[in-house]
Amino acid sequence: RKAKAWYYKGRINQDLGHPLKAQEYYLKALRDEEKIEDHALLGRIHNHIGMLYAYQKVYEKALPFQKKAVEDFHLINDSTGQVFALRDLGRTFLMLGLQDSSIICNQKAIALMRKRIIPSVYTELAGLYIDRQRMEEAHGLLRTSLQNVAKPQAKYPVYLVLGELYKKSGQIDSARFYLQACINSAPLPETRAGGLFHLKEIALEKGQWEQAALLSKQYELLKDSIEQGKNAESIRNVQAFYSYNEIEQDLWEARLYAS
């Protein structure tokens, strides 16, 4: 019961934009982890902690929590929980440079899906396939993503990957169409930044130096704005505090931070 209360306090603080406070409550929820029999709750807690670490770019800390989330949902045969946990784990593997592991996570996630298709998993696997020059497979995955997006604004991350695919396939007009749509209309700044980056690369390849310089300036300004909103060092700095806090004893660190 205490664990669930701490979890909900963590969720409230996370929703209010207080990641460090949320992290503290989630860690408190896991203080007696071995006594918690609710694996659905454990899966959510582990996944949220992993997500917060990943958001702050502390990927080496995110990894063990995300692995535990996958295990928790597997124990109760929660396929949807596993899909999201595997997707998030795949993202962390990718940020750590482990592309093969990321591909496996997304492939497993797709295999677990039933009637409910989660487009983001297809989109992310498509991006990984593009890096491996598996263009036809990537295009098929992106078609599935577009056919299953729930809201119009959700199409823009798919457009971004489509733009990259067409750019790398030499279909520049198609690439520009999808990338410009991201810049003009995508709700997330990360998606708009991706569009600017790829259009800048196209301009450089075409020798359009003034256009490339303009796009590069816009990209850097947007990237700086995104980074200012994510205080990546803050969570790293509080690790020293957590290490001496009752929340994290030596056994706790050995059990949860070892991958």
Regions found by a protein language model. Give the residues of each.
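TPR/Sel1-like alpha-solenoid repeat signature
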Residues: 2-13, 25, 32, 42-53, ...
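Coil residues (strongly favoring Ser/Thr
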Residues: 33, 73, 79, 100-101, ...
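Hydrophobic positions within repeat-based interaction scaffolds
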Residues: 100, 139, 173-176, 180-259
